[in-house]
């Protein structure tokens, strides 16, 4: 709706009320009624200053009015939001680089500690970035020691956003499968939970250092919102230590570059796209025994926050421990149990037997397939399949039995010299067709027939005779 324009008459009413004690005691409606008779008796010259003042006020308001974009948003507000986002991203990158560089300069890169954290949520508000948390997990990690400690808990917010029960049920059933409030599991006191999280992060990173957690790029907004949801319930004054949420994928990139530099390896082919692709492959996605008991029992380990932070730690170890010659420990750097579910089948060709395509890297020591011992590791079933494949002789089941190499078998197309050739005899053709599965053998010799042989009257005469 367009704003209302200023009126010369209302400018006169406001001036009269400001300069007359009687007008200050009147209401606006009474002043308008009183000044109406005076305005009618005024000449055009007397009304001129008030009308020009109204136009000047319209111009001033138009200059103060904020410009909007095509979505109805203020351009200045949108630019400010973009500027704040760019500054926040730059702060995140500089802080992450500073953490890695300081550890590298102190020759203690393998002992640098990082905390990975993430949330599960029930639902998200439609118009704002408010998330209702459902589960939280954090993991303290270093390259040398692997997973140092894990903090995991379920959250019972007590209620969800009004009118979003269906969305919450759909999101829960397709992901973490946690029961909705009021039947939710876990901690109900949000202030107590937030203090416990702050206490755990302080224990991991020190009382004099900022509280920094790392999570994937697409989860940063959600994790920040869930921390604000818990913090708003805390009135004890511990909220002064703000938890900062940084990008774990950028940490992987910077840490990989630093590790390769320390190891003296060429890092020209390492960029953000390579490290992001490696992180998103999630090689340990189906690892069992690293999720909470609830998700283990309900077969939702992929969406468990405890499983997520543990898999991220395993990914870091798998990607960088080999560069620093760090011995990986089961349960710390890699899963406690590694069960390869592949089977190697020997090929017929000797060249393929020596050039196996199953040779790839596995995190568990001793699980690499070696070419020199490849022939000894074949199972009984694979050997039987290999022997059966070598004894198999293919059979041609086509009906065409003519020799394709003979020029005489094909008709002349005009450019080829014609050659006299007589067709094969009946006995020869019968022998050729005998090997074809879809052509029956003739029960009698082929001979020429006339039209009388198929006549009804001639057939009757033959029967009578």
Curated annotation (Swiss-Prot):
InterPro entries the record matches: HMG_box_dom_sf, Maelstrom, Protein_maelstrom
Pfam families per record: Maelstrom (PF13017)
GO molecular function: transcription cis-regulatory region binding
DNA-binding region listed in the record: 2-69
Location of this chain's protein in the cell: Cytoplasm; Nucleus
Keywords: Cytoplasm, Developmental protein, Differentiation, DNA-binding, Meiosis, Nucleus, Oogenesis, Repressor, RNA-mediated gene silencing, Transcription, Transcription regulation
Region of interest (Disordered), ranges: 415-440
Tagged with keyword Nucleus: yes
Family: Belongs to the maelstrom family.
Protein's recorded name: Protein maelstrom
Encoding gene per record: mael
């Amino acid at each position: 709706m367009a704003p209302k324009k200023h009126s010369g008459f209302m400018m006169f009413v406001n001036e009269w009320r400001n300069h007359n004690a009687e007008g200050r005691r009147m209401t606006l409606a009474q002043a308008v009624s009183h000044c109406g008779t005076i305005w009618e008796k005024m000449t055009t010259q007397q009304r001129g200053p008030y009308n020009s003042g109204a136009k000047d006020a319209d111009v001033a308001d138009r200059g103060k009015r904020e410009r909007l974009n095509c979505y109805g948003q203020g351009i200045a507000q949108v630019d400010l939001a973009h500027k704040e986002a760019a500054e926040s991203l730059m702060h995140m990158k500089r802080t992450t680089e500073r953490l890695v560089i300081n550890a590298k300069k102190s020759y203690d890169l393998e002992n640098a500690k990082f905390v990975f954290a993430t949330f599960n949520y029930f639902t998200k508000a439609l118009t704002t970035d408010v998330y209702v948390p459902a589960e939280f997990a954090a993991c303290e990690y270093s390259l040398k020691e692997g997973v140092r400690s894990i903090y995991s808990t379920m959250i019972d917010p007590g209620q969800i956003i009004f009118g979003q029960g269906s969305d919450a049920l759909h999101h829960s059933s397709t992901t973490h499968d946690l029961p909705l409030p009021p039947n939710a599991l876990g901690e109900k006191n949000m202030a107590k939970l937030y203090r416990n999280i702050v206490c755990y992060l302080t224990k991991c990173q020190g009382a004099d250092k900022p509280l920094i957690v790392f999570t994937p790029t697409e989860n940063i907004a959600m994790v920040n919102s869930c921390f604000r949801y818990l913090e708003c319930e805390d009135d004890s004054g511990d909220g002064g230590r703000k938890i900062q949420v940084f990008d774990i994928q950028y940490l992987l990139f910077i840490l990989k570059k630093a590790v390769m530099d320390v190891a003296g390896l060429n890092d020209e082919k390492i960029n953000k796209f390579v490290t992001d692709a490696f992180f998103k492959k999630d090689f340990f996605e189906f690892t069992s025994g690293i999720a909470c008991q609830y998700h283990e029992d309900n077969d939702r380990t992929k969406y468990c926050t405890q499983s997520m932070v543990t898999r991220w730690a395993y990914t870091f170890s798998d990607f960088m421990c080999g560069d620093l010659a760090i011995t990986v420990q089961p349960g710390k750097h890699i899963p406690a149990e590694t069960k390869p579910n592949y089977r190697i089948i020997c090929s017929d060709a000797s060249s393929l037997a020596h050039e196996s395509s199953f040779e790839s890297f596995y995190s568990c020591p001793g699980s690499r397939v070696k070419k020199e011992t490849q022939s000894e590791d074949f199972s009984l079933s694979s050997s039987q399949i290999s022997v059966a494949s070598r004894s198999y002789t293919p059979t041609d089941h086509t009906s065409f039995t003519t020799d394709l190499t003979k020029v005489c078998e094909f008709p002349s197309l005009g450019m080829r010299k014609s050659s006299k050739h007589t067709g094969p005899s009946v006995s020869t053709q019968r022998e050729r067709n005998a090997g074809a599965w879809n052509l029956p053998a003739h029960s009698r010799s082929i001979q020429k027939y006339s039209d009388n042989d198929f006549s009804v009257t001639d057939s009757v005469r033959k029967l009578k005779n």
